[in-house]
Amino acid sequence: MNYEQNAREQAEQLRAAGHATILAIESSCDETAAAIVRDGRQVISSVISSQIPLHAMYGGVVPEIASRAHVESVDPVVDETLKKADMRLEDVDAVAVTYGPGLVGALLIGVSAAKALAYAANKPLVPVNHIEGHVSANYVSHPDLEPPFVCLVASGGHSHIVRVDDYGVYTLLGQTMDDAAGEAFDKAARVLGLPYPGGPLLDKLSREGNPHALKLPHVQTPGRYDYSFSGLKTALINTVHKLRQNGQDVPAADIAASFQHAAVELLSDKAMLAAVETGAKTVALAGGVASNSGLRNTMNDKCQKAGIRLVMPPPILCTDNAAMIGSAAFYRLMRGEIAGLDLNACPSLKLV
């Protein structure tokens, strides 16, 4: 029996049993991460190797540097993950990996490592969509959570509102028409002279400012639940440049607070509109921007007023990690969705 026949047979056995312990790998951008997750909810071990110091001097992620760092980190990260769990590779039931979307070079490192591990251990290989991983982080932090629910996914590369109809089944309700929310936050931070990564620093600075100091536009979009952040970003840039050209001080805290307030209101208004109009009883947050304190507080207030349950992962599970990939992989495995050794990176992969 060859590898792929054996993997399919094992996957069917795991599906019938309804249980699986999965080694997951995440390398879509600038974190090399691995985790061991049991039954999609219980994290046995999780390790994240961040590349922030490598990219800080460039003000953003440099794809070539990211790929090289993944090559250096992936084996040690996997080894440490197994060690923390007091397990050997042979003890896991399957290997999972993010295969898109993301930086193609970075994705290829994780995919190659996962294929090698799956083949060496003769285990099924489970391909996972990175965005689905972010959604699934909520299953780890809230073990009682079950579909259906509405999820706002906001990160550096993506801004979606999706209805989670079932495990792995999604309906796209809205999306950004231009910039992603995290991209807009990072650009605003750079304009204010904040170092990389700027989003968390802008969040911190905004707490010292007046959120109503600057009137920023709320751009209308053709889609009822769609987003547009380009006008908001441009208005901020023009305001700062005008102040500097006139020799005036740039009140960084007030500008940060005003930008964050406008962005958070846009994100939360659309998400709540989608939730109310679709009759959702639960709203989830996901993605790196979900760690923003303003968004978390605002969504909490609005959900309480609407009588809707809000779930959101802790910040460590909002940013890229492999625990979320292991969670998503479990439900894919339970549907019999595995990959062969011809699995390739898909940098433009869509969720739906």
Residue map of PLM features:
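Short beta-strand scaffold segments in enzyme catalytic cores
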Residues: 32-38, 151-153, 159-163
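N-terminal beta-alpha supersecondary unit
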Residues: 17-91, 97-101, 130, 134, ...
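Glycine-rich phosphate-binding/hydrolytic loop that grips phosphoryl groups
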Residues: 313-351
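Conserved phosphate-binding/catalytic loops in two-lobed NTP-binding clefts
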Residues: 127-128, 299-324
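Glycine-rich phosphate-binding loop plus the immediately following alpha-helix
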Residues: 143, 166-208, 233-234, 238-242
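Conserved phosphate-binding catalytic cores of ATP/NTP-utilizing and phosphoryl-transfer enzymes
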Residues: 5-20, 128-150, 328
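Short Gly/Thr/Asp-enriched flexible loops that form oxyanion-binding sites at enzyme active sites
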Residues: 97-123, 140, 293-302
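A contiguous, well-structured pocket-lining segment that forms one wall/lid of small-molecule binding clefts
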Residues: 204-283, 293-306, 333-336
